């Protein structure tokens, strides 16, 4: 692990940031699929050189070891098939084994904070400090109550999670170079697509994956709130499976086919046709969406309480569930904020082959691939 730690690029500063302009292959390992992206800078443009959406075939009852082997073999096979020569990899973590805290420390230099990080961070981390890998990024310097301080993003990831991810990458023939957090990877995409005319108004991201939803609020290019919410695509699938007393695979198919009914005219038509299947699916998704809306409200209230003149300008959906039919419209109606679905390839040339319904799932992977052009000193 010492060798690996010396080469890791950052959980917003984990280890030494060593990459310059070299390319990295981005590997986003989700619970449902592996997303792989390789970008190449060609003059002023970014070109997609390789991409892959690799469903994880391991069965639900598969052991962690069986699942790991499945992921390694799938990833290695893809790299060989696509003749990907780049061997330095960027990946990201999320879930309940990763903690992100915004902390104010007495003003220290980066070197001083690196030396004393474990001591300074321990009060803010709900894990044994010896069981986590720590990283940090200094956001700003300030004076508070007459004392000089630094505002810092503090990240802690359980060492066993970091080691497991490193083992997968190395098993596939890759060298772990950068380890980030899902929400911070999305921040890189945000920098490319954000409208500077929005000023201080923030964007809320909902990266709705299979098991976890990454919620983040980005203000002026800086992520100010990060949460992982365990209301996700699989939660919707389970609700549909319960309502129809069917297998998860069938429920997932129904979710993709029907989505949620939003317009009153569509609802009236569905009722007139007696389409109980569509109505039942919409009701099941709607119930889960209400729980997600509640979590969004809590996060927004927290963000607004942190300072004056704060507002959410829009919400951006990403992740594999973002394309669920009418989910964006439903959330917009519930939250009274414009909601759009992310296309992380909108500024990338050569991405025409990526299907529209898969694009939102690549938000984290594209953000990781951008780390070649945006790193921290």
Question: Predicted segment positions?
Answer:
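Hydrophobic/aromatic-enriched cytosolic interaction surfaces used to assemble or bind macromolecules
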Residues: 1-377
């Amino acid at each position: 692990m010492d060798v690996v730690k010396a080469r890791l690029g950052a959980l917003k500063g984990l280890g030494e940031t060593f990459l310059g302009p070299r390319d990295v292959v981005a590997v986003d390992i989700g619970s449902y699929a592996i997303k792989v992206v390789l970008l190449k800078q060609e003059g002023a443009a970014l070109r997609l050189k390789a991409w892959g959406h690799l469903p994880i075939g391991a069965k639900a009852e598969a052991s962690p070891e069986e699942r790991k082997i499945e992921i390694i073999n799938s990833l290695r096979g893809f790299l060989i098939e696509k003749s990907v020569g780049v061997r330095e990899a960027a990946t990201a973590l999320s879930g309940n084994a990763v903690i992100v805290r915004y902390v104010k420390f007495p003003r220290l230099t980066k070197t001083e904070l690196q030396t004393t990080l474990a001591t300074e961070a321990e009060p803010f981390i709900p894990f044994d400090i010896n069981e986590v890998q720590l990283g940090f990024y200094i956001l700003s310097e300030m004076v508070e109550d007459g004392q000089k301080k630094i505002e810092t993003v503090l990240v802690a990831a359980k060492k066993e999670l970091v080691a497991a991810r490193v083992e997968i990458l190395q098993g596939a023939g890759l060298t772990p170079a950068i380890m980030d957090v899902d929400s911070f990877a999305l921040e890189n995409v945000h920098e490319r697509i954000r409208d500077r005319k929005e000023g201080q108004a923030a964007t809320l991201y909902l990266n709705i994956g299979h098991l976890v939803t990454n919620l983040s609020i980005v203000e002026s290019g800086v992520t100010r709130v990060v949460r992982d919410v365990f209301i996700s695509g699989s939660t919707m699938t389970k609700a549909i499976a319960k309502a129809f007393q069917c297998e998860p695979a069938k429920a997932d198919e129904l979710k993709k086919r029907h989505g949620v009914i939003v317009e009153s005219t569509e609802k009236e038509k569905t009722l007139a046709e007696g389409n109980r299947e569509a109505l039942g699916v919409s009701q099941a998704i709607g119930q889960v969406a209400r729980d997600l809306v509640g979590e969004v409200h809590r996060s927004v209230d927290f963000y607004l309480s942190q300072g004056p003149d704060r507002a959410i300008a829009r919400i951006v959906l990403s992740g594999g569930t973002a394309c669920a039919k009418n989910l964006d419209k439903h959330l917009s109606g519930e939250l009274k904020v414009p909601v759009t679905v992310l296309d992380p390839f909108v500024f990338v040339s050569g991405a025409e082959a990526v299907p529209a319904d898969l694009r939102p799932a690549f938000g984290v992977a594209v953000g990781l691939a951008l780390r070649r052009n945006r790193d921290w000193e």
